[in-house]
Amino acid sequence: MCMRRFYICSQGDNLAIKRIGIASRCDRPEVLDMVREILARFSSQVQIFVSTATAEVLGIEGTPVERMRDEGVELVISVGGDGTVLRNIAKMKDPLPILGINMGTLGFLVDVEPEDAIETIEEVLYGFSYLERMRVDVFLNGEMLETATNEIAVMSAKPAKIIQFEVHVNDCLLDEMRADGVVFATPTGSTAYAMSAGGPIINPRVNAIVVVPVAPFKLSSRPWVIPADSEITVKLLEHKKDAVIAIDGQKSYRIRPEDIVKLKKSKFPARFVRISDTCFYERVQRKLS
């Protein structure tokens, strides 16, 4: 399964959670005000570690997100939008559970609205369940680059230019494409770029990766859903035509025709605090309406 549920519960009236982390956007006053409100409300109840970037803006001592697990942090409160969540997850090799406060727009990865934040955090401190979502390790010429939570996009390095490439699954040719690019998405990322490119929405309980060509030249190049434990290889075919690989829309790397890109399911899933019993299908419909 690519989505599993775990529980952390309190004993009696005692808080189950003793140490939490906070990491936020730093460029919006309302986001920083929310962080200040959380600190004012809960600093006397639990030990709070604030990310270095957020702490610098607030003028307090900070802790890198990468070190929060070593400090005994049990969950990270991410204040911002989906991009903030993805950046925070990417900083952790083995991600801590994330509780997302939605200060963005659409927000598929952030379930808590600002007006509900304090009450929700208070409930979570007495115990919570979390869901594990699969991620994908990205390798370039055998060297690991990053781990993607949402998607990996391979696109032309020059705007409005198509690229020609092959996609192999476990050494079997899936397709040879001429297109603007291709998106490889996890079930979590199937509602992001992959969906905009015409790919299917995948329930997180489905253990799969979706392959979505972006503006393909031939009509037979269609989206594919493949097993999550597959090894995917991407090879550029045209000499002197470079491409760019973008990971979760956060980091990008230039690739050349002689380069080999491989994608494999990661051993370290993302973990999201569960705060609602709303079913997946209803939740997606609500977000998209």
Curated annotation (Swiss-Prot):
InterPro entries: ATP-NAD_kinase_N (IPR017438), ATP-NAD_kinase_PpnK-typ_C (IPR017437), NAD/diacylglycerol_kinase_sf (IPR016064), NADK (IPR002504). Keywords: ATP-binding, Cytoplasm, Kinase, NAD, NADP, Nucleotide-binding, Transferase. It is found in: Cytoplasm. Coiled coil: none annotated. The keyword Plastid does not apply. NAD(+) binds at residues 82-83, 87, 150-151, 161, 178, 180, 191-196, 215, 250. Its EC number is 2.7.1.23. Gene3D superfamilies: Probable inorganic polyphosphate/atp-NAD kinase, domain 1 (3.40.50.10330), Probable inorganic polyphosphate/atp-NAD kinase, domain 2 (2.60.200.30). It is an enzyme of class 2 (transferase). One of its GO terms (molecular function) is NAD+ kinase activity. It catalyses: NAD(+) + ATP = ADP + NADP(+) + H(+). Transmembrane segments: none annotated. Pfam families: NAD_kinase, NAD_kinase_C. The keyword Nuclease does not apply. Its cofactor is a divalent metal cation. Its main location: cytoplasm. The active site is at residue 82. GO terms for cellular component: cytoplasm. GO terms for biological process: NAD metabolic process; NADP biosynthetic process. HAMAP family: NAD_kinase (MF_00361). Belongs to the NAD kinase family. Involved in the regulation of the intracellular balance of NAD and NADP, and is a key enzyme in the biosynthesis of NADP. Catalyzes specifically the phosphorylation on 2'-hydroxyl of the adenosine moiety of NAD to yield NADP. This is NAD kinase. It comes from Methanosarcina mazei (strain ATCC BAA-159 / DSM 3647 / Goe1 / Go1 / JCM 11833 / OCM 88). The gene is nadK.
